[in-house]
């Protein structure tokens, strides 16, 4: 069984840990700048028209590509979490200590906030869009949607990046993570906004000064990420036994 490790402050303030926090800050800043920037660009190009299908696809693709890059550039330094829900899920599965995870959260939230204020500045003060549950849906539906799509994201992180049995699959981890996020935004964007990432929702909320319904984007992703970590960490990584399929079985 995987266990949660509290860790020590000495380890969390080592040079390697400080580098990891900086890497998380930079990766999250770049991801949020591109992701939120794509939503701002869409609003400008369409004169604030309602989101349509081409716009949803463009924003989903932008988030997927940006996360692919953000994870890849941080992978060898911090693991490329770029998301408090990913960090939480990995902590639940014993892949990162709680203390280090808290500092990851701080770096991620600061990176997202910095990205959104930079966007507000370079766009001449254009509105920074925030996540919200679609009209006609309740907060509970939004939470459930975020639980499901964040579970899919963190499960993908475990399968392609955290699992020691991943083998050559690890080389495509950033791509797989980017793809699942893009796909989930296509599926959930019109309903919950498709956040999967408390930091992605936090920065825009701070920059816009609008925290209405913001709790949905903490509760849903943290439950989904925690469940993925609990299940994958204990069921699929809890045993060292692994029998790969023979090549003839593919």
Curated annotation (Swiss-Prot):
Protein name as annotated: Aquaporin TIP2-1
Subcellular location: Vacuole membrane
Motif placement: NPA 2: 197-199
Topological domain ranges for the Cytoplasmic compartment: 1-20, 76-98, 163-168, 237-250
Annotated family: Belongs to the MIP/aquaporin (TC 1.A.8) family. TIP (TC 1.A.8.10) subfamily.
UniProt free text on domains: Aquaporins contain two tandem repeats each containing three membrane-spanning domains and a pore-forming loop with the signature motif Asn-Pro-Ala (NPA).
Keyword Glycoprotein applies: no
Assembly with partners or alone: Interacts with cucumber mosaic virus (CMV) Protein 1a.
GO-annotated molecular function: identical protein binding; methylammonium transmembrane transporter activity; water channel activity
Tissue expression notes: Strongly expressed in shoot, rosette, bolt and flowers. Also expressed in roots, flower buds and above ground.
Primary role: Aquaporin required to facilitate the transport of water from the vacuolar compartment to the cytoplasm. Does not promote glycerol permeability. Its function is impaired by Hg(2+). Transports urea in yeast cells and Xenopus laevis oocytes in a pH-independent manner. Transports methylammonium or ammonium in yeast cells and Xenopus laevis oocytes, preferentially at high medium pH. May participate in vacuolar compartmentation and detoxification of ammonium.
Expression triggers: By ammonium nitrate in roots. Expressed in roots with a circadian rhythm showing an increase after onset of light, a peak approximately at midday and a decline to lowest levels before offset of light.
Motif (NPA 1): 83-85
